[in-house]
């Protein structure tokens, strides 16, 4: 259990920094993509903002548990194991969520694809951390 918590905290910190930096760079270099977020669907009164920033840690704890349970199924060096882990998670969890989001919300395909790629990147990065720290 200690290994799950430790790797989750390490991955959470790394994902938080990368996510926050990626958001800043995304707005700076791809402002057109973020125009779609000027929509009542995405506006919040600010009372739940902390939940957004905790996302990196929530996903890291979930993925850390998943890694600890199924790590024996991923073969190869730590890079191959981390990438395969990210791909498996993306196909099992992200793809269905993106499908239902696109089909039920008033969002465009580019937005959904950016969410999928963001989630895939998070899962691969977390997988690399887990494969290195908790082989």
Regions inferred by a protein language model and the residue ranges of each:
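Juxtamembrane/disordered regions of integral membrane proteins
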Residues: 1-135
């Amino acid at each position: 259990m200690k290994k799950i918590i430790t790797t989750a905290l390490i991955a959470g910190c790394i994902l938080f920094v990368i996510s926050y930096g990626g958001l800043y760079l995304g707005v700076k270099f791809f402002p057109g993509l973020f125009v779609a977020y000027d929509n009542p669907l995405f506006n919040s009164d600010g009372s739940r903002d902390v939940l957004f920033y905790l996302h990196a840690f929530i996903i890291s704890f979930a993925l850390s548990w998943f890694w600890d349970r199924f790590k024996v199924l991923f073969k190869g060096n730590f890079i191959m194991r981390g990438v395969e882990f990210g791909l498996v998670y993306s196909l099992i969890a992200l793809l269905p969520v993106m499908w239902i989001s696109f089909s039920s919300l008033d969002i465009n395909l580019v937005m959904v694809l950016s969410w999928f790629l963001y989630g895939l990147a998070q899962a691969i990065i977390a997988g690399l951390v887990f494969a290195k720290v908790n082989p």
